[in-house]
Amino acid sequence: MFNRLCFQCLIGGLCVSPFKERARKDFDYDFELYEKDRAMIVIQNPKIEEYRDRARLTANIDVDGTTRAVWFEVDPAYGEFLCFERSDAFVVGLLNWAMRNGHDIVCEAPVTEELLYQITEFLIPSLSKSSNALKAIKIEATTAPSLSNARAVGTGISCGIDSFHVLAKHIDNNYNSFKLTHLVHNNVGAFDVYKEKSYEVREALIKRAQKVADAVGLKLIVSDSNLASAFPQNHSYTHSFSSCF
């Protein structure tokens, strides 16, 4: 969800977006043209709202006649970077669930053209051919160009060997477009494995991540989301999707 700062792909996140210059506009979709007999997920227009002391990006998701609200939130300082103009984050976050349950996806807001092309032409065909559990679904959406952004570069910091490797490789290199500006701690499903201890475990990991951020002189962005509870999945198999949310 954090493609809005706009984090270079070291972090993945699609919820964070471009900088300023955003046309606040609703995008209409002609649902009458869609096959009515197919099971589908409808991603309504995302919106930004204040929730307690956080900035929250929310989209109502219609599934088989019921509606679930999916949200992603950050500190208000980063609220302007949340991306309401595209359905990108929600498409990626729900793609695995949709393929496993045989639901096509319909988006009210546009999807970035390059992303929709890669998912439709390469990712879905490859996944559906490699696993009988994943259906070759359709995504119906208008396309739009990539949004301008603040050119930030971030990566997740779990304090595991992989995240430290990325940190070491990109904290100071010769490529400005890939030089880290932020570290990120997301909550998109991994902490459910700790059940009743999940809150305590997450708070301890945030403190540890903050120590690392302070030590290397980078800002830490802490996000939260209900994606895992709104659409329960096995995080071990789906983290590649949810981590890009």
Predicted region positions:
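Short, Lys/Arg-enriched N-terminal segments with co-localized hydrophobic residues
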Residues: 26-39
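RNA-binding accessory domains that recognize and position tRNA/RNA substrates
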Residues: 37-152, 166-226
